[in-house]
Each structure stands twice: as C-alpha cells, then as structure tokens.
Amino acid sequence: IEQYAPFISAVFADIQHGIADKSLRSSNATLDAYLKFLRLTQGRFGWQSVIDLLEQKEVYSCFGLNETDVILIRHWVAETRIRWGKSAQHKKQLQLPESVENTWQAGLDRLLMGYAVGTDDEFFADVLPYAEIEGNSADALGGLYDFIQLLFKASKVLAKAYDSNEWAETLLKYAELLFPAEVMSAEQQAEKLQINEILLELSTDINEVHDQPILLSVILAWLDGRVTETKSANGFLRGQ
C-alpha cells in the first residue's frame, strides 16, 4: 500500500482521511531521519548522504536553518569541493591515504576561515579561506557547523560496543541532541515520542536474549525490523 500512498492522498485531498498498513518508518519522518543519522555516523560521510539528511525539514529546522540556507550550504559544499570523509584521520582509519583534501573538516575550515578574514588571497594557518561568505550567512554557517560536529561526535561514541541498557540511554541522548524538544512542532514531538518508545522496547527485547556488549550494526538490524512493521492491519483507508 505504501507505493500507492501519494496517489491516494492526491485523490482524497479534500476528504479527511488516513492511510493504514504503512510501516512506522514511512509514516514517521522524524524516525526515518533518525535512522539515517545513525547509519550515517558509521559510514564514509559522503557529501550527498550528509546533505540528503540535512535537507530533511525535520533535521534542518532543528539547527535554525531554512530551505534557503540549505540551498546555500549545498552550494558551499560544491564550491569547497567536499567529497567524503570526516578528516585525514578518518581516511586513515578506513585504511586509505591520510589526506585532508576534500574532507568535511577541510571544507569547514575553509568556510570558517573565509567568514573570519573575508579574503582568499593567501593561506592562513595552512587554510585557504573561502571568501564568498557574507555576514548574513552566519546563521547558515553556524547551523552547518553544529550539524557536522554532532555527526562527528556521534560517529565516535556510536562506534563502541554497549549493552542494551547503555544503548537505549545513548540513543535517547542523541535523539534529543538531534531533535531538541524546544524547537520542534507538536507533530514532530509526537513523532519523537514514538522514537523514545521504540528505543525503550529495544532495551527490553535485546536483554531477553543477549546481555553482552553489542555493536551498532546489531542495533540497526533490530531497528530496521521494528520500523518495517505496519502501524495497522485493519484496512487500507480509514476515515478520521
């Protein structure tokens, strides 16, 4: 039914309705964004994956950004030639040449230095400033910086093994950091509440079969199974 959901919504746009038999993930955009965030922290930090996550309204709005800011950020990423990798050290951990070029750290350094000095005529502290940063771009740059730093921090914390109770506590913490309650709409807060409920279920379920420290890959496998469950099996279309 999920593949037909957009067509149903278009046909019944003037009628109050809801579509049942949709998975938790497809019916909760905040949950979907959170799962992408978790998976991204253990990946290569490819620029497209990072920007795709930031472009979700549920995410960018939590960092004080709007659609115009996100378009500008995409432009900055292209101009500073960010491609993949957190840093030179991250590339080394992936058993690749330890080069800072085209990493997120290199791009952020150029953007921040450009905002600070406003010229690209020479290097400062081995960084070539990106000069096309205007004063009114401060909010966009600040939001991007905070978002990337949260990803960087999470990538280190979530790379470790924890028991199920520690995982529940850690994941609840990062749900709050990614989606601060004070900047969320009532609808988003309701979606976030569902995330919290699922994470508490995770602790109980895994405790029943496994009490040793486990990695994020195991947690993601459990979450993927949980969020593909349908919300309702009572029909395809119901009135509200």
Regions found by a protein language model. Give the residues of each.
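Polyanion-engaging groove/track-forming segments
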Residues: I1-Q240
